[in-house]
């Protein structure tokens, strides 16, 4: 039996290889670089790797081949397993930009008095002498940087995967590092470890559903490739029961990653317990990668059987928006409130997925569902990373002050920080002149054009509900008095280094610019074209 050498188009996938290469080098750094120098080496390596990969993504995007009638640009590479097309590269760019912000937050040390926000010795039991000694000596886990890079590489591969097997491998590559990172908080170790365990257990459960669904779809179509699956669906060559159950089980795995109801229960616990830098990276990156994979799977592999999965998404989108918006109202912790806000935003994004897919079905100047969802992900990513960066600044003697009562009067003591946080919240609420307003307008418009008006009505109502809990926090910061009775000390705002400051500044600038001048990014999403098939 002859072995056939696989063909790898290095010129197309080298940004992805850079990310994985930096992750591998980061592992070697842990073994060969002295502990005292690891922080600088690992942080510089991760930031440089992300920047190089981002530049590479731009260069690859400039040279994409135009296919067919010009609606799609790109190629199917690596023996048909990876689609390097316009949407994939747009998503890669988003992931790398937000990963750069995440890396800067990972590298922040001023807020914790000269050490990072990560545990000094992860293997030490909370409250033991070993943990106290690790804290006293100022130890920290620099392995978080290669873990972040492995997760980033998995996210990029997840969004570009062109067959079910590659999609599953990418899912595991992005998930496993995040499970570890969620349990490495320096403060509130038990809460962090609980979050990591819940995330791992539920994530493993959802991965099992995904893998079983892939097996059923393979049984239906005889192929793992998206194009071949679509041909089998169009020609109705197999058992429809296998197909429908397979679509449902694949959807479980994807809906878990985006935090959609009823697979959202991990979101508030993990967002609250994980180090806030990890939460920021995960909140933006995981949602972007998972929606990229979902769009490609539903539009390319199951595009010929739209009415088999669309009614399911109608129901899930409405439930997700309602549950996220209503439960966020009763939260008393900032990170849990942002977690349920994230659930509601997942519902808004699912509304966009239900929209019109082909530009030929729309009038000139209207956006497709792919363009609308991509733009929404950009606006949400900048707002959520910036918001969590601000959360790291509000602190008391126990570390970050997440309880609402500790945020009372922050607007009078630190008006700039409170104003920036309020601006991010207003963008998430979809207030005009912010990026969030344009993002919601885009996804609601495409869903309405596709006839999903019940979902749009529910989305508008949930947006109104969401304004309540966002404005509630703003009123808390600016118009309520400090409360020190029975609640301990009032939280203060810690001055960050240039790393966190830069992340917040870019988030504010992008949110403002995209709200006032959204055209260039909408055009960029339109120029990305459709998925290659």
Curated annotation (Swiss-Prot):
It is found in: Cell membrane. It catalyses: a quinone + NADH + 5 H(+)(in) = a quinol + NAD(+) + 4 H(+)(out). Its main location: membrane. One of its GO terms (molecular function) is NADH dehydrogenase (ubiquinone) activity. One of its GO terms (cellular component) is plasma membrane. Coiled coil: none annotated. One of its GO terms (biological process) is ATP synthesis coupled electron transport. It is a multi-pass membrane protein. The chain crosses the membrane at residues 13-33, 40-60, 87-107, 141-161, 164-184, 200-220, 243-263, 275-295, 310-330, 337-357, 373-393, 417-437, 451-471, 502-522. Its EC number is 7.1.1.-. InterPro entries: NADH-Q_OxRdtase_suN/2, ND/Mrp_TM. Belongs to the complex I subunit 2 family. NDH-1 is composed of 14 different subunits. Subunits NuoA, H, J, K, L, M, N constitute the membrane sector of the complex. NDH-1 shuttles electrons from NADH, via FMN and iron-sulfur (Fe-S) centers, to quinones in the respiratory chain. The immediate electron acceptor for the enzyme in this species is believed to be a menaquinone. Couples the redox reaction to proton translocation (for every two electrons transferred, four hydrogen ions are translocated across the cytoplasmic membrane), and thus conserves the redox energy in a proton gradient. This is NADH-quinone oxidoreductase subunit N. It comes from Nocardioides sp. (strain ATCC BAA-499 / JS614). The lineage of its organism: Bacteria, Bacillati, Actinomycetota, Actinomycetes, Propionibacteriales.
């Amino acid at each position: 039996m002859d072995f056939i050498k696989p063909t790898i188009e290095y010129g197309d996938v080298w940004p992805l290889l850079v990310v994985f290469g930096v992750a591998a080098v980061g592992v070697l750094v842990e073994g060969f670089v002295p502990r005292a120098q690891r922080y600088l080496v690992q942080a510089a390596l991760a930031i440089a790797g992300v920047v190089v990969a981002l530049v590479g993504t731009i260069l690859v995007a400039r040279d994409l081949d135009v296919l067919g009638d010009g609606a799609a640009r790109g190629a199917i590479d690596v023996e048909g397993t990876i689609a390097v097309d316009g949407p994939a590269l747009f998503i890669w760019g988003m992931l790398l930009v937000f990963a750069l912000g995440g890396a800067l937050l990972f590298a922040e040390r001023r807020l914790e008095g000269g050490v990072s926000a990560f545990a000094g010795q992860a293997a030490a039991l909370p409250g033991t002498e070993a943990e106290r000694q690790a804290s006293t000596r100022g130890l920290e886990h620099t392995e978080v940087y290669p873990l972040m890079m492995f997760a980033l590489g998995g996210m990029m591969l997840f969004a570009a995967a062109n067959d079910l097997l590659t999609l599953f491998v990418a899912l595991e590559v992005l998930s496993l590092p995040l499970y570890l990172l969620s349990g490495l908080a320096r403060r509130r170790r038990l809460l962090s470890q609980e979050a990591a365990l819940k995330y791992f257990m539920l994530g493993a459960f959802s991965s099992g559903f995904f893998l079983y669904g892939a097996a059923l779809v393979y049984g239906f179509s005889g192929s793992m490739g998206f194009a071949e699956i679509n041909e089998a669906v169009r020609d109705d060559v197999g058992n429809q029961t296998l197909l429908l159950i397979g679509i449902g089980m694949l959807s479980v795995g994807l809906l878990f990653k985006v935090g959609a109801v009823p697979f959202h229960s991990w979101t508030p616990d993990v967002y609250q317990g994980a180090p806030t830098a990890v939460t920021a990276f995960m909140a933006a990156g995981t949602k972007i990668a998972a929606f990229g994979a979902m769009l490609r799977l539903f539009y390319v592999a199951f595009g010929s059987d739209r009415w088999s999965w669309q009614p399911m998404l109608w129901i899930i989108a409405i439930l997700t928006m309602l549950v996220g918006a209503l439960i966020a109202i009763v939260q008393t912790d900032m990170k849990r409130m942002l977690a349920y806000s994230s659930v509601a935003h997942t519902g808004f994004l699912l509304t966009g997925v239900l929209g019109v897919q082909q530009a030929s079905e729309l009038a000139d100047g209207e956006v497709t569902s792919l363009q609308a969802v991509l733009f929404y992900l950009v606006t949400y990513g900048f707002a959520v990373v910036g918001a969590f960066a601000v959360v790291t600044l509000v602190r008391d003697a126990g570390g970050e002050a997440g309880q609402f009562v500790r945020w009372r009067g922050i607007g009078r003591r630190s008006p700039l920080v409170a104003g920036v946080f309020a601006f991010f919240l207003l963008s998430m609420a979809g207030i005009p002149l912010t990026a969030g307003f344009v993002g919601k307008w885009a996804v609601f418009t495409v869903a309405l054009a596709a006839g999903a008006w019940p979902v749009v009505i529910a989305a508008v109502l949930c947006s109104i509900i969401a304004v309540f809990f966002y404005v509630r926090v703003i009123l808390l910061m600016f118009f309520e008095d400090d409360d020190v009775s029975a609640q301990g000390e009032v939280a203060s705002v810690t001055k960050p280094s240039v790393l966190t400051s830069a992340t917040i500044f870019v988030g504010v600038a992008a949110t403002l610019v995209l709200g006032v001048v959204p055209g260039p990014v909408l055009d960029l999403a339109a120029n990305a074209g459709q998925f290659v098939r």
